[in-house]
């Protein structure tokens, strides 16, 4: 049996401020740092270890992974970073307060932008200061690859391309893997692994910094999945609450 651990980054500064983040590179809040330490302690207490780690090129996911591995005394584990594991790009919504945006455009429209599978938010323009295609971390992207906006379907395509080319072969080689990423990135992976319909993924929420374990067969088909707490596996349908750490 193969085990895969997925973890969404700890609370970010813009999570705290209720702002659309997307590819904006904001850091963890103090609470997010605590959540990451707690996740590492949970994994260590439950006897987990890793051979390889994957994350995005955004600091909130990277720092969460660093902290988790530090808490587990696994700072030596190789870390592979890819923009393909970045959060969904929220286009012109990035940086805006979610409540204020709902007041401006209507709650129904914002809900469609946030939760539908195939509807993109308004796009950035290339002269927008939030357009970061010249950032050196994206220098390997080909012309036209840097998104101006994304729907979940767009995010899923790049995430699954990286899954099939990099992560799946690593798992099949017998390596224990952790992925530290973002809410919509993990939603994309869960949708694929659990073969969820578009309707099924609409209501799927991924909590910050709670380890989500997938037990997979040799073909990487899920046997079962569950969240972890200090007391071990959490009953299906329940999500553990954070403790002060």
Curated annotation (Swiss-Prot):
Protein origin, superkingdom: Bacteria
Reactions this protein catalyses: (2R)-2-phosphoglycerate = (2R)-3-phosphoglycerate
Record keyword Nucleotide-binding present: no
The keyword Isomerase is assigned to this record: yes
Gene Ontology molecular functions: phosphoglycerate mutase activity
Enzyme Commission number(s) of this protein: 5.4.2.11
Its biological purpose: Catalyzes the interconversion of 2-phosphoglycerate and 3-phosphoglycerate.
Stated name of the protein: 2,3-bisphosphoglycerate-dependent phosphoglycerate mutase
Name of the coding gene: gpmA
